[in-house]
Amino acid sequence: MKSPSIFNKIKPQSIQQHPEKNQLNWMLELNKWKEERILTGEIHRPECRNEAAERISCAFLSKQNDIDLSGLNLTTQPPGLQNFTSINLDNNQLTHFDATNYDRLVKLSLNSNALESINFPQGRNVSITHISMNNNCLRNIDIDRLSSITYFSAAHNQLEFVQLESCEWLQYLNLSHNQLTDIIAGNKEELLLLDLSHNKLTSLHNALFPNLNTLLINNNLLSEIKMFYSNFCNIQTLNAANNQLENINLHFLTYLSSIKSLRLDNN
């Protein structure tokens, strides 16, 4: 299923409204980082760090909100990214990303890297709403404190467990193609799409998703669906194919008043 782009235009917000006191420091760090490419295995593409450093400097000086560093084969995180609200680092070779102090960050895309760990923004003023990090090597993530998140996609990783009870504004959640055996989501009144397909789930916890439009739980190990019937009132797409469902309660089908696509085959 094609995921919507997370790099839509965001509201103007000058990154220069509150200039960093340590601006000179991070620019010096950026120059130092640029010269370290040979020590980090990037000698085969020495121009990549030069290009990244140039983009960061130009974007900052021209007061841009977003920075695109995709496809530069980077193996380490460049300095200076805390100045931007939207960061695109798709198609690199990063194994770790630290956004702990990125208070301005709203949208982050780290698709198709080699991520094994990530630190998300922390604190009271965190405003991040969109995170996409499909096609990585993540086993564990902690987004439970990201109360402002509305879009989260971490498909094609190695996640075994996810907890996101505090993400009350979540609208889009894609955790397909992982190793999930359990997920604790809590009540999500804003959730519209939930994709948990291609995992190892044996059951689903009771939780309230009153506005859920699309539920994809195919290709798991589910023997039953323990969800409140009220979750299905607005469902238009439900795919529970390729599980181990033994009995389908016909009473459950009466709640699918809005259904347009239903798959229960191979159970």
Language-model segment annotations:
Residues 1-15:
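Non-Sec secretion/translocation targeting segments of pathogen effectors
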Residues 35-96:
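LRR N-terminal entry segment and analogous cap-like coil->beta motifs
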Residues 60, 70, 80-83, 90, ...:
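C-terminal capping segment of individual leucine-rich repeats
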Residues 67, 87-89, 108-110, 129-133, ...:
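Conserved hydrophobic beta-strand positions in leucine-rich repeat
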Residues 72, 92, 113, 136, ...:
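Consensus "Asn ladder" position of solenoid repeat domains
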Residues 77, 97, 118, 141, ...:
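Canonical leucine-rich repeat
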Residues 219, 233-267:
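Leucine-rich repeat domain C-terminal region
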